[in-house]
Amino acid sequence: MIKVSVVGAKGRMGSHVVEAVNKAEDTQLALALDADDDLTQVTTDNTDVVVEFTVPSVSLNNVLTLIGQGVDVVVGTTGWTDEKLTQVKSAIANGPKPETQKVFIAPNFAISAVLADYFATKAARYFESAEVIELHHPTKVDAPSGTAIHTAHGIAEARKAAGLAPVPDATETDGGSRGQVVDGIHVHAVRLRGLNAHEEVLFGNAGEQLTIRADSFDRTSFMPGVLLAVRKLAGDAPAGLTIGLDHFLDL
């Protein structure tokens, strides 16, 4: 059995993770911790893998503390910048087990979203234009989503590798309606009551358009991906920092 601790256990995502861990046949809940709990309770004696699902303002400190405890970490919290990732890599290198420490960060755990992102990177080289639209519930604290940023980076890298020119755009005045530009790709965020987590990637050429869309209607859609990451970290996942569930899928 894989002993799993959950940080953020009372949150919207964390509570679903606790339920999923309890239901799975090969995992057991070790500790369920929340905002006021001491993370140094999590040790290699009681935990094989810890799942961290909190908010961007505290996630980095949580992950650094857990690395210091020597436990492997699955991170579902979004809002990761290059600067934060550099701190994680440094913590691993200077932690108690630099050669074997595993940290996994997922922009999205939904299989549909991971596949949509993968398909988008494959399609990007064939289209002159590309834009990303992400749509979420109004209680989400970051915008654009980590998934959308990850998708935009992937599209930009694929376009660069193919030698494509910048996306055409004759806009001269923009009060913000064109969205955030991520590596030359416009990313738009919608926050609307009734939504959960959705993403559309639009590709265009003269006379044609390709739309790739992923919809997660309920948070249970993320649980297979979370459990996959837990099993991989408890098994044959490489040491160090890994970003993206696509690394654990046969794509």
UniProtKB/Swiss-Prot annotation:
It is an enzyme of class 1 (oxidoreductase). NAD(+) binds at residues 8-13, 76-78, 106-109. The active site is at residues 136, 140. It holds the Pfam family DapB_C. It is found in: Cytoplasm. CDD domains: DHDPR_N. GO terms for biological process: diaminopimelate biosynthetic process; lysine biosynthetic process via diaminopimelate. Keywords: Amino-acid biosynthesis, Cytoplasm, Diaminopimelate biosynthesis, Lysine biosynthesis, NAD, NADP, Oxidoreductase. GO terms for molecular function: 4-hydroxy-tetrahydrodipicolinate reductase; NAD binding; NADP binding; oxidoreductase activity, acting on CH or CH2 groups, NAD or NADP as acceptor. (S)-2,3,4,5-tetrahydrodipicolinate binds at residues 137, 146-147. This is 4-hydroxy-tetrahydrodipicolinate reductase. It comes from Bifidobacterium longum subsp. infantis (strain ATCC 15697 / DSM 20088 / JCM 1222 / NCTC 11817 / S12). The lineage of its organism: Bacteria, Bacillati, Actinomycetota, Actinomycetes, Bifidobacteriales.
